[in-house]
Amino acid sequence: MIFMPTKKIVIFDFCGTLITFQTADRYVMFCVERLHDSKVVRWRHFIIRMMDKLRVFKIYNLIHPDNNWRKRMVLWQMKGVSYDLCDKLAKKYFEEELLPNVVQPVVKKLKGHLANGDRVFILSGGYDIYIKYFAKYFGVKETMSSKIAFQDGVCLGKMSGKDCMRENKVECIRPYLDGEDTICYTDSQSDLPLLKLVDEPVVVSHDSSQHWAENHKYKQIIWN
């Protein structure tokens, strides 16, 4: 009898897990820096900077920690930009910013699971417009992420549907988990609801062990 390895459902967070940084706002800023000829974009960027300086977002986040208002306001800067340009910049963002900043030990795990034939998902609050290029490059067929809203080929400056964060991640992936062996890789404590749902939670930590992961006795991948 030939032993066949068991196929698993494997979930990878994106920001801080596969990529070394938080990617959503940075994508918008990558675009804004290349849209400097637009007075409207420059004016919106000025407003965001002033709100940061006055700590408006920080204060609001203390009251409404799950709203992520700053992320929504940052995305507002893109209102009116064509889909074609957003997509062109997303590909450039992947090539220039994401690919050089992958977390190598986690990407190695990703490749291993794909080679094993496991069903791999990228589940992220990052934006689909650039995650699709990462997924295509590494051969990941299934992604669930926050989406930028477009209408008639123009960015609306807001998200389409729910932001794929915290409990929303669980809602997205739960239908795929029943009766399957499951693994999840993430760096963030905000993903605790997801980690508690899977059979094998793995926390990705930068430089040193994270206390919350230790407290839950989770396996860790520590990279530097």
Question: Regions from the language model: what does each represent?
Answer:
Residues 21, 64, 80, 166-170:
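Electropositive phosphate-/nucleotide-binding environments in soluble metabolic enzymes
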